[in-house]
Structures are given as structure tokens and as C-alpha cells.
Amino acid sequence: MEGSDFILVVDSSVEEQVEELAMYLDNLEANTDKNVLALCREYLASENVKEVLNLFLTRLPLLAQAPEKELEPILAVFINLIQESAAFEDHVSKFCQALEQIADQNNNLTPAILSVLSILFNTAVKERQHARLSILTSVVTLTTRYSLFSTLAPNLKYFPDWLKEAGVSVSDHRAFNIFVSKAIQSYDDEQSFAFLLEAVKMDNSTADEAVRELVQRAVNSPKYFFFDDIVTLPPVQQLEQSTLQLLGILSGGMTDDYVSWVAENHAHCQHQKFDEDAIARKMKLLTIASLATQAPNNTLSYGDVAKSLKIDENEVELWIIDVIRAGLVEGRMSQLTKTLSIHRSSYRVFGKHEWVALHEKLAKWGSSLRYMLQVMEQPLSSFTIASSKKGNRDGSAVTASE
């Protein structure tokens, strides 16, 4: 799918195209009635093209028996027929349903059907919003149903622009994002979460099921650590106080805060399907990250980690390895001094204190750079003076010899 302007050219009249498609359907072994051509001629005689198209739509699933190499050309004929239809968007919707039925009956034809959907998408006028929604919905359905996600993945980033070009309403766009999120979750959890997050951002009016699912997935995910972009969303702020307290702890609290919270909210966790063990593990990693940002001289002792996590000091290295793997901290461990030398740490909340700390680090860095520049310039100046003196001596020697 390209999303660019596309012109489909079929060099024949409407009547010839109708007869070609009707004869093809009648010749299929699965079509026992063999009456498509006769009915089409009857409808054409009364200039009832709409009934011709409706008839084709009911018989297109017969193409499940067609050879793969013939499917795309014959369906291109139907695409051309519906281009000038007054009920174009309705016909596209039913056409997409028929294509899904063909794939369900013969999933070997799915790649060819996706190619047909691509042609249909590129020939559909951008402003026909419901047509684009129908086509993209079928593309997502077929690629995820028949394990062809690799075909879909490169196009996901274009979905917002394509729907915006078509003028799709906010409510329809939101519903589509939720649909995509569910469809692709087993293939790409990160992309799925991104579509759900965008859906939640589109409606500030209520905390519906999508909002609760977003929070649940973020809280339980072993890879999601920064909650600022979720906590501030208006629909999330409408959730019950217990959930907001948990999000606040995940944003800037420590392990002790979570232990206290979960002791009072065990039933709430079960009701909201929050994974207490997964959150406890996440809080330990986040606690280490916070300790790392506050460590004096960028050195964190194992003892401080053990104290904050309420664990034996012998377990600290394993947790530090996990927090480094999670990308929250970078550093070097020393078994001799039982410390972590911190090279980089992630701030969970970036407020006034963090801005002050950043300013101090940048000032220190600037001072170090100025000192290094002075050190580097000093030998260069000495070398220039020495070279000048040597040149003068050589010149004098030449003059004397002459």
C-alpha cells in the first residue's frame, strides 16, 4: 500500500466488463446456478447497474476456487465497475467483507487479496473516509488473522496520515486505533500499546474500558517505566483514587511506598487485574534508578540498595544487572568496593530539583572542557615558539656559511 494517487485503466465498456466478470463467475465449478450472466443482462437492459453490483457482491465469494494468478485481474474489473457508483462507500464495505470470506475459504489467496485491497485503497478518493476505514480494517484483519504481520508492519506509521487525509471523524479514528491495538498485540506489543495510547488521547470526556486497559498494560508491562505521559491524561485523571495513587508511586515513589499501598489495596489490584508481583519487581528497578540519580559523586553503595529494597546485600548485583538491562542505569560494578560507579541514570520525574542538578552537571562539564582546552593549547604554543627559534638558528647558519 502506497497511499498515493493511482489510476486503474480498464480498456472496455461497462457492459463488456460486466459480461467478462459474469462469465468468469458462471464458469467456476462451485457456481451450480450458472445464472450470473443472464441476471446481469436483465439488469443492464433496464439500466440497473446498482443491482448488477449487488449481485456480484453476493457471488464474489465463489472466487475462493479461482487460481491465484487469475484472482487479481478479475477483481480489478469489479474495482473499476464500482468507481462511479453512487453507493461507492457501501459497495467498498461489502466488497471488503466478500474478500475476507474468500480468504476464510482459501487462505492461500490472502496475499493476492491484500494486493487487491492495495489497488482498491489507492484508487479510492481520499475524501471517502468510510471506504478507507473499511479497506484498512480488512487489511489489518487479514494480515493478523493469517500471520502476515510483516506485510502490515511497515504501513502502520502511515495510518494516522491516511485517515487524516480522508477526514475520518475523531470517534471513528479512535475506534479504529483500539481495533488495531487489539489485532496486533500478539505480534508487536509496543506498537499495540502506542495505538491504544493515541486512542485514549483522542477523547478526554470519560474513563472508558480503553483507558483502563491502557493503565493495566502500562502498570503490568515489564518494559514500561515512565508514566508521566499517562498520568497527566484527563481521562486517566478520572479514574478512582487508588489507581491514581499507584500511578503516582510508579512515577516517583519508592519500594516502601508500594508495599504500603498494596497492603491496603489488594482487592483493588485483583479487581483491576494489576499484577502485584510484576509491579513489585518494577518498583525495585525504579527505586534503584532513583537512588542512582541521587547518589553522591555518582557512586551507589550496595548497602544503600539493599536497605531500600529490603534484600540481602548478596542479591544486590543481580538487581543492578537487571536495572542496567532495562536501560534505566548505565555503570560499572565493583565487587571489591561493593559499589556501582554510575555513568548514566534515568530521571523518572523531571522537576525543579532535576533541572537544578542538570544545571550543576553542565556547569561542571563546561569547566572541565575549558580546563582541557587550556591544557591542549599550552603544548601547541610551546611548539610554535620552539619551531620559530629553531628556524631562526637555521637561517643564521645558512647566512654564515654563505
UniProtKB/Swiss-Prot annotation:
<comment type="function">
    <text>Component of the eukaryotic translation initiation factor 3 (eIF-3) complex, which is involved in protein synthesis of a specialized repertoire of mRNAs and, together with other initiation factors, stimulates binding of mRNA and methionyl-tRNAi to the 40S ribosome. The eIF-3 complex specifically targets and initiates translation of a subset of mRNAs involved in cell proliferation.</text>
</comment>
<dbReference type="GO" id="GO:0071541">
    <property type="term" value="C:eukaryotic translation initiation factor 3 complex, eIF3m"/>
</dbReference>
<keyword id="KW-0648">Protein biosynthesis</keyword>
<protein>
    <recommendedName>
        <fullName>Eukaryotic translation initiation factor 3 subunit M</fullName>
    </recommendedName>
</protein>
<feature type="domain" description="PCI">
    <location>
        <begin position="188"/>
        <end position="347"/>
    </location>
</feature>
<dbReference type="GO" id="GO:0001732">
    <property type="term" value="P:formation of cytoplasmic translation initiation complex"/>
</dbReference>
<dbReference type="InterPro" id="IPR027528">
    <property type="entry name" value="eIF3m"/>
</dbReference>
<comment type="subunit">
    <text>Component of the eukaryotic translation initiation factor 3 (eIF-3) complex. The eIF-3 complex appears to include tif32/eif3a, SPAC25G10.08/eif3b, tif33/eif3c, SPBC4C3.07/eif3f, tif35/eif3g and sum1/eif3i. This set of common subunits may also associate exclusively with either moe1/eif3d and int6/eif3e, or with SPAC821.05/eif3h and SPAC1751.03/eif3m. The eIF-3 complex may also include SPAC3A12.13c/eif3j.</text>
</comment>
<dbReference type="GO" id="GO:0005829">
    <property type="term" value="C:cytosol"/>
</dbReference>
<keyword id="KW-0963">Cytoplasm</keyword>
<dbReference type="InterPro" id="IPR045237">
    <property type="entry name" value="COPS7/eIF3m"/>
</dbReference>
<dbReference type="GO" id="GO:0002183">
    <property type="term" value="P:cytoplasmic translational initiation"/>
</dbReference>
<dbReference type="GO" id="GO:0005852">
    <property type="term" value="C:eukaryotic translation initiation factor 3 complex"/>
</dbReference>
<dbReference type="GO" id="GO:0016282">
    <property type="term" value="C:eukaryotic 43S preinitiation complex"/>
</dbReference>
<dbReference type="InterPro" id="IPR000717">
    <property type="entry name" value="PCI_dom"/>
</dbReference>
<dbReference type="Pfam" id="PF18005">
    <property type="entry name" value="eIF3m_C_helix"/>
</dbReference>
<keyword id="KW-0396">Initiation factor</keyword>
<comment type="similarity">
    <text>Belongs to the eIF-3 subunit M family.</text>
</comment>
<dbReference type="InterPro" id="IPR040750">
    <property type="entry name" value="eIF3m_C_helix"/>
</dbReference>
<dbReference type="Pfam" id="PF01399">
    <property type="entry name" value="PCI"/>
</dbReference>
<dbReference type="GO" id="GO:0003743">
    <property type="term" value="F:translation initiation factor activity"/>
</dbReference>
<dbReference type="GO" id="GO:0033290">
    <property type="term" value="C:eukaryotic 48S preinitiation complex"/>
</dbReference>
<dbReference type="GO" id="GO:0005737">
    <property type="term" value="C:cytoplasm"/>
</dbReference>
